[in-house]
């Protein structure tokens, strides 16, 4: 959507992308593990990454509902742009917009709201799946 529709990502958008990337990396590594302790560690890292995503997406949704809390200058921009992936993959991980900029909704929700739903579902469903799998094996 960023390239096709010209929707510039803000610092909170980029932080949500980092959270999604971490969830994917930890999930793939955890899926490749055979040691129960290592699997548990990576399951925990997936949930922690999703909690970080909940924080970023939640604040983004709040900023979109109450744009007056935004000062017009995103103080996170230099921090997010200073992260290594912003230099390696600038199209994906470099800040170009403001967090309070409204974009047209997708199926009634903004992208930040969709991201929040996805992160919350991850936080709920991953531990639930872990619990169910461990109960089956016991």
Regions found by a protein language model. Give the residues of each.
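Immediate flanking context of iron-sulfur cluster ligation sites
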Residues: 1-8, 27-30, 90-91
